[in-house]
């Protein structure tokens, strides 16, 4: 049976007509009755402007074979998307021509009018509104109906149709590649009722995808693939690619893309989280780590952990020399420099070195005269914020640091630490010349000047010189009437308030400094230190003439007088 396409001038032949591909000789006759066959048995026919080739039917798959017999009860049409009863598909629409008697299935199950009928083609469903499978030129009997096409053919070994593809001949449909089945991006399978009944396409099997379904973006944007388009991983055209396999239950519809409101007009720079937890340079940026106690936020989680040690009192970093503990490793490194004597930060103007960079910055303000921190009460300015805080406590009389041993309070933490050495007897600062040790560094400096006979501090009133500035300040009060401290019990006057406090203990009997070994108490810390040497056997004061050592400086002075008397 022959039909003529309305617009293309191509002659469509039924697959099962005597002159079709099913002839025993494997030949195809043109309208003039001529037959052409190449060396390998492949048949080529030229009609109008179109060329197509039909492969030779393999042995055993002729239409006369029992597996391919349309009248056989086992035969079922193989197009799963060819459903005459689906909406929009009218089997009686104008232009519909029923298939030839040789092709029409005889069993009730294959009757197009039967409700149980389902087309078996696994890959073809026309989606274009203007192209129906039953429109002229779209019959299954067309020479271009080929289930064996790489993208749409049945994989069942019992059935292989030899036509090169199923191509609609309607004027609005234009095939992209006759050898690769339907290539137009408009002809995609969207039918949710798609159900494969072939034994090769049951649940869990694989079925091929068309090249357009491999590229969902071309579907969304309406881009039609070109015949000359090549894949990115090879130079062969799209039509020559092998079929893709995909699970049968997969959705073949193109995904929907949401258009951005402003996809290209971007401003600023987007930065991802880096080493510092996404915090931007300059201290600005997100601070996602929030302290659950005080609510302070931090850009890095490690900084939050360090901050929380303020609340918990945890000090995991311990000095191996003195066993002092710190909450941060940087504080431990700074502390260790007090034992090693390392001073890596040096002033470029005077050459003075410091163990901490903050001390160097503070020192450099002495050269520049810069004092940015001003007291709001008296207007006095300071070069460092810690000096200002210390000064402000003189106005508020605040003493937040108290000794746990004796309860004495101090306005500075450093003063409390120096005081606690009185109770522990610790004297970490020793003289390099005589070996004498001190609990405070400030006491070691004037002692070192005593060996050099250096007295850099001179009284402006009388010209007397002193080795310590504190001693000069005490002396200066003697020239200022009314700047003395008198005892309210006996009326005795003193130049220093600390001396008055020590004197008052003679009236009250208070002995706050107690020996940890024998329990003996003293009213002065210096007396307790001298007493500690009785238990330790320490003799830091050594005679330069005979080498004899003493535990107290007064004993050394008394001994040196014996040598002076002998020289006379």
Swiss-Prot record:
- Report C2H2-type zinc finger ranges: 289-311, 317-339, 345-367, 373-395, 401-423, 429-451, 457-479, 485-507, 513-535, 541-563
Coiled-coil segments, which residues?
A: none
Name of the protein this chain belongs to: Zinc finger protein 768
Q: Cellular component terms, GO, for this chain's entry?
A: chromosome; nucleus
Point out residues bearing the modification Phosphoserine: 17, 23, 27, 36, 65, 72, 79, 86, 93, 100, 107, 114, 121, 128, 135, 149, 154, 191, 323, 327, 470
> Which residue positions does Phosphotyrosine occur at?
152, 317
> What Gene3D superfamilies does its record include?
Classic Zinc Finger (3.30.160.60)
Please give the Gene Ontology molecular function terms for this protein.
sequence-specific double-stranded DNA binding; zinc ion binding
Q: Which portions of the chain have biased composition (kind: Polar residues)?
A: 110-122, 159-186
Q: PTM per UniProt?
A: May be phosphorylated at residue 'Ser-5' of the tandem heptapeptide repeats in the N-terminus. Phosphorylation might be increased upon RAS pathway activation and negatively regulate protein stability.
Q: Where is the composition biased (Low complexity)?
A: 62-80
Task: Please give the organism.
Answer: Mus musculus
Region annotation Disordered: where it falls in the sequence = 1-223, 228-247, 264-287
